Amino acid sequence: MSHGEETELLLDPKEERFVLLPIKYHDIWKMYKKAESSFWTVEEVSLDKDIDDWGKLNAKERHFISYVLAFFAASDGIVNLNLVERFSTEVKVLEARFFYGFQMAIENIHSEMYSLLIDTYIRDNDEKNFLFDAIRTIPSVKEKADWAIRWIEDKNSDFATRLVAFACVEGIFFSGAFASIFWLKKRGLMPGLTFSNELISRDEGLHCEFACLLHYHLKKKCNRIKEVVMDAVEIEKKFLSESLPVNLIGMNCNLMCRYIEFVADRLLENLGEERVYNATNPFDFMENISLVGKTNFFDKRESQYQKAFVGIENGNDSFRIDVDF
């Protein structure tokens, strides 16, 4: 912890405690209960129809989905590495540690889901192993992974800056790929893939909101928010318009770039900054499914995955980041 971080309550060893009650940070605790109510397992996702649908896709579509899944499978492990090695040890507030502990379990489920999807769709073992090792074998995936790992290994940047960086990993690096899978849903294809995408995108939206909430609690905010966000945006735009262009599945690359800018603007506002891109959402099918600022799109347990009675409590919200734009 740097000298400037010594006064941060979130990082202050004096805040460390082993008994939960009484709750001290009610907004952080409420976010944990929201995550807890959204627990799911891979056994709830049926892939039976996906196997038939996979054969209906053309070679470009299969290539695109395979590479997106390869990125996702690697990225959840990277997020967990950061939680284990950095955030969960740096943050001393117990309510936040509860959230991080639960997030690690959820990221494990995501990783299991993506690995299972690859294992189900890809029959050739060499291709399967190539995809499982994507951060070494696929340059475009490696570039995104390297960006995230750089922040884990960074010993000079303060907690606030690294918090923003991982909000970008979960809020921006995932956004375009999530949208591309929802695009397939419009065609009525791959119901297992698209359902798991709904579950995972909601989880990641909540994780991104949590990062914004912790940043809100910091006395010393990150002074490089726009720089970090814009850097992530450029990497993501390159990934989905050049390295793995979405036109492989019939999407418009320019519209995808605008969508990434739209998501970035919302993240910036949730971090207390002005918009940079002033982008509108070009995808009507993503209106109610956005990673940042809207996590209330789950109304059915084919999407209805909130556990009964979990998270019901009295009290007012002290922090809101669900503003509609």
Curated annotation (Swiss-Prot):
For this protein, the record's Pfam families field holds: Ribonuc_red_sm (PF00268)
Which reactions appear under catalytic activity for this entry? Answer: a 2'-deoxyribonucleoside 5'-diphosphate + [thioredoxin]-disulfide + H2O = a ribonucleoside 5'-diphosphate + [thioredoxin]-dithiol
Say which domain of life the source belongs to. Eukaryota
Molecular function in Gene Ontology: metal ion binding; ribonucleoside-diphosphate reductase activity, thioredoxin disulfide as acceptor
Q: Enumerate the cofactors the protein uses.
A: Fe cation
State its Enzyme Commission number(s).
1.17.4.1
Active-site residues are Y114
For whether the record's keyword set contains Oxidoreductase, the answer is yes
Which InterPro entries does this chain map to?
Ferritin-like_SF, RNR-like, RNR_small, RNR_small_AS, RNR_small_fam
Explain how, and how many, cofactor molecules are bound. Binds 2 iron ions per subunit.
PROSITE patterns per the UniProt record, alphabetical: RIBORED_SMALL
Question: Which terms are listed as keywords in the entry?
Answer: Deoxyribonucleotide synthesis, Iron, Metal-binding, Oxidoreductase
Known role? Provides the precursors necessary for DNA synthesis. Catalyzes the biosynthesis of deoxyribonucleotides from the corresponding ribonucleotides.
**Subunit details:** Heterodimer of a large and a small subunit.
Q: What is this protein called?
A: Ribonucleoside-diphosphate reductase small chain
